[in-house]
Regions:
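Gram-negative and organellar
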Residues: 1-250
Length: 250
C-alpha cells in the first residue's frame, strides 16, 4: 500500500519578460506542476506532470508537456540509490513571422541513475548517470545526450556547501546542411558549480532569530566545445536568492 505520509503538490507560475530594445523578444510564460511524493515498501516514489506555455511577442507560441517518475531506496546506513524516467512533448504553433517553428517539435525520453554515499555526518557525495534522446519532426534536430555528474556536499554547522561538476555529451543523428554539408554535429558541455547556503540569523541575529531565512549564493561556469565552431562558448554566472521555511499547522 502507499505510504501514509504521502503528499501532493500543485504549483503554478507566471513570468513576464520585457526588453527596452528589441521588443520582438518579449514574452509571457505560464506553468503548472502536479507532483506526488509517496512510498511503496522501501521505495520512495515521486511521479509528476508539468505543463507550460510561452507566448512570444512575434515568434510562434510554444507548448510543452513533461511527465515522469523518480524514486530512490536506501541500502544500509550510508548508501542510497536513485532512478528516474521522463517523457516530454514540445510543439510550436507556426505563425506568419515564424513559419518554420514546427521543425523543432519533438518528443523526448530520458533515464537517470544515481548513487549517494554518506562518509560521515558532514561529508557526503553523489554520482549520477543519464541518457536521453530527442526526436524532432525535422531530422537535423534529432540528438542523443549522455550525462555524468559528481557532487561533494559539506554540511558544516555554520553553512552548507555543495560543489558539483557535470559532463554532457551530445551526438546529433543527421547532418544540418544549413551549417555544414559533410559533418554531423557532436559536442560536449562541462558545467562546474559551487553553492553556499547560510541562515541569515547567523549573520544578523535580530533579523532572523529563528534562523529560518536562508541566503543562497551560487556560482556556475559552463564550457561548451563542438566539432562545429558555431557552438563553442564559455559562460559564467553568479546568483543570490533567499528562501524561508515554515509550517502551516503551527
Amino acid at each position: 500500500s502507499l505510504g501514509e505520509a504521502s503528499s501532493f503538490m500543485i504549483n503554478t507560475n507566471v513570468s513576464d519578460s520585457r526588453q527596452v530594445t528589441e521588443t520582438t523578444d518579449d514574452f509571457e510564460s505560464y506553468g503548472l506542476t502536479l507532483a506526488l511524493d509517496t512510498s511503496l515498501g522501501n521505495q520512495s516514489l515521486s511521479p509528476y506532470l508539468m505543463l507550460s506555455k510561452t507566448d512570444y511577442q512575434d515568434d510562434a507560441d510554444s507548448f510543452s508537456l513533461m511527465g515522469g517518475i523518480g524514486g530512490y531506496f536506501p541500502v544500509g546506513d550510508r548508501n542510497s540509490f536513485s532512478y528516474g524516467y521522463s517523457y516530454s512533448d514540445s510543439w510550436n504553433n507556426s505563425n506568419s513571422t515564424d513559419t518554420s517553428a514546427w521543425e523543432t517539435d519533438s518528443i523526448g525520453h530520458g533515464i537517470t541513475l544515481g548513487h549517494d554515499f554518506a562518509f560521515n555526518e558532514i561529508i557526503s557525495s553523489s554520482l549520477g548517470l543519464g541518457y536521453s534522446i530527442s526526436e524532432a519532426r525535422v531530422g537535423t534536430n534529432d540528438f542523443e545526450t549522455y550525462d555524468f555528474n559528481v557532487r561533494l556536499n559539506l554540511a558544516f554547522p555554520w553553512a552548507y556547501i555543495s560543489i558539483g561538476d557535470a559532463l554532457s555529451f551530445n551526438d546529433y543523428m543527421h547532418v544540418d546542411t544549413s551549417i555544414t554539408a559533410d559533418r554531423i554535429r557532436s559536442d560536449y558541455v562541462n558545467a562546474f558549480d559551487l553553492m553556499l547556503t547560510k541562515a541569515l540569523g547567523d549573520l544578523i541575529p535580530f533579523l532572523d532569530r529563528s534562523k529560518s531565512l536562508y541566503i543562497n549564493l551560487s556560482y556556475e561556469k559552463v564550457v561548451s566545445e563542438a566539432n562545429i565552431i558555431n557552438y563553442d562558448y564559455d559562460a559564467e554566472s553568479v546568483s543570490i536568492s533567499f528562501s524561508r521555511s515554515f509550517h502551516l499547522n503551527k
